[in-house]
């Protein structure tokens, strides 16, 4: 619910204050579930109530000076959202990206990494991390990592 999201945001802000006092940053990494819609307690069970996307509630309910977001672009797409829309709407909130594809970067055809990187850099990206999961049969994790590295190393849009 919206009320639950508000509580989570309060906890995130408190954690961010504690982290800041210790000289470290506190951030959050999404999955696809954050792109579901939450509704107000009073609207639960009512027909036609659309609700708010949980991720938007989190971004709007947290202090950018205390909480950063590490967008997992794969799970954002799996949540039926466009990472570019989030970079535009919440510029500066994603200093870190979690780059992932269905398996090897650039091979699924479902992730437009060129547009993702270009817009992310334009809106404040500092660094990114790659996760490789769902490695196909017959390939070692090291071979998969090498293919991901090669893809990014050759990509003219990666700084």
Which residues fall in each region the model found?
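Active-site acidic/histidine proton-transfer and metal-coordination neighborhood
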Residues: 1-68, 142
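Histidine-acidic metal/acid-base catalytic patches
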Residues: 38-39, 43, 52-71, 75-159
């Amino acid at each position: 619910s919206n009320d639950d999201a508000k509580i989570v945001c309060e906890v995130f802000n408190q954690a961010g204050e504690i982290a800041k006092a210790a000289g470290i940053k506190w951030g959050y990494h999404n999955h696809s579930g954050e792109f579901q819609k939450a509704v107000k307690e009073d609207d639960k069970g009512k027909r036609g109530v659309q609700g708010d996307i949980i991720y938007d509630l989190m971004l709007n309910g947290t202090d950018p000076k205390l909480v950063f977001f590490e967008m997992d672009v794969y799970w954002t797409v799996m949540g039926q959202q466009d990472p570019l829309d989030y970079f535009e709407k919440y510029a500066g909130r994603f200093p870190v990206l979690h780059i992932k594809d269905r398996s090897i970067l650039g091979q699924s055809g479902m992730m437009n990494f060129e547009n993702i990187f270009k817009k992310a850099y334009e809106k404040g990206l500092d660094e990114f991390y790659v996760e490789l999961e769902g490695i196909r049969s017959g390939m070692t994790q090291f071979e998969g990592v090498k293919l991901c590295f090669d893809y990014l190393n050759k990509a003219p849009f990666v700084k």
